Amino acid sequence: MNIENFDLSDLEGVGPVTKKKLEDSGVHSMMDLVVRGPVELGEISSMSSEICEKIVTIARKRLAETGAITKDFASGSEIYKRRQSIGMITTGTDALDALLGGGIETQAITEVFGEFGSGKTQFCHTMCVTTQKPKEEGGLGGGVMYIDTEGTFRPERVVTIAKANNMDPAKLLDGIIVARAYNSSHQVLILEEAGKTIQEENIKLIISDSTTGLFRSEYLGRGTLASRQQKLGRYIRLLARIAETYNCAVLATNQVSSSPDSFFGDPTRPVGGNVVGHASTYRIYFRKGGKNKRVAKIIDSPHHPASEAVFELGERGVQDTEEHLKQLDKEAKKAEKEAAKPVKKSKAKAKADGPEGVDATPAIEPEGIDTAAAEPEDIGTIVSESADAGEPADPELE
């Protein structure tokens, strides 16, 4: 039985009346209960905190028993085994895939920040295509939910990228669910009600572009900073919970600002402060690199080393540079050349085998002649005497 299809009424203490309250509040499954949590559940359903805590606890235990979510306590081996189910979505470029260790990871938030024109939205459009590729081609064969807060989603761009990847544009567009957010409250609401759509549409990637734009424009001045961060934190936590409970990836773009107290180095800083920084699993910095090139740098990661990758924007969306492709071709030819070389024998084996072209098998000695005792001239004398005596010559010596 699929855990995602467990009915809410299967839970102890959830009758028809409670079930209706939950569904009216946008809670349709046990996963939704775990994602929301007891505090938020009480706010949206008007149920008492005791009932909410009881329902969420029962749902969490039920899901943990079936292996849908991690138990409260688990060994390192269990966590390692669970992480084997984590998927990777290719970025469409060898350089970025190598930088990220295979691509965008599920059950995690990958934050991409950078100034305008650095390629963030183009990257999002590219991921709309690569996510829907089959697993053998680096995708997950699932849909995409695109939360558009700036009105920058362009289906025409998806069509161009799809054609460049030899994929059906119409089918790809049908696999993208776009939600246009007009204010920060609407942005949070979209995510709160996303659970049912994620299950029904087999969503494997959630794109939030941009994550902080609406919060930044609505909450101005230091006096509103606390309220903004509290609301933004709730949105980011929802993203993290959804990514883990539904085993999907989250790609969140972020705006930047300049730090006035930075006298050396790059003054560019991502917006959102520690609230966004602590919630993001991976932080990638996009910057312009001259002409059509862009540079991606890992700023924060639990296991990736700090490194950079160069890519460019083109017909395929984000793509490898010509220099990188030439380098890959050069390395491939070198590998083929090395594989074609004959295997060299070790000195010991070569000595045992003897010189090349010479039979190393010991020669058969003439029968009846002690070559070890006789000198070369003695052997010649013996042969001569045998011939003079009228005896047939040994055929081995002729």
From Swiss-Prot:
**Disordered, as annotated region:** 320-398
* Pfam families for this protein: Rad51
User: What PROSITE patterns does the entry give?
Assistant: RECA_2, RECA_3
- Write out the GO MF terms: ATP binding; ATP hydrolysis activity; ATP-dependent DNA damage sensor activity; damaged DNA binding
Q: Which GO terms describe its biological process?
A: DNA recombination; DNA repair
Recite the UniProt keywords alphabetically. ATP-binding, DNA damage, DNA recombination, DNA-binding, Nucleotide-binding
Residues where ATP binds: G114, E115, F116, G117, S118, G119, K120, T121
> Spans of biased composition, class Basic and acidic residues?
320-341
Q: Which family does it belong to?
A: Belongs to the eukaryotic RecA-like protein family.
Q: What does this protein do?
A: Involved in DNA repair and in homologous recombination. Binds and assemble on single-stranded DNA to form a nucleoprotein filament. Hydrolyzes ATP in a ssDNA-dependent manner and promotes DNA strand exchange between homologous DNA molecules.
By its UniProt entry, which PANTHER family does this protein fall under? MEIOTIC RECOMBINATION PROTEIN DMC1_LIM15 HOMOLOG (PTHR22942:SF30), RECA/RAD51/RADA DNA STRAND-PAIRING FAMILY MEMBER (PTHR22942)
State what protein this is by name. DNA repair and recombination protein RadA
What taxonomic classification does the UniProt entry list for its organism? Archaea, Nitrososphaerota, Candidatus Cenarchaeales, Candidatus Cenarchaeaceae, Candidatus Cenarchaeum
Point out the gene that encodes the protein. radA
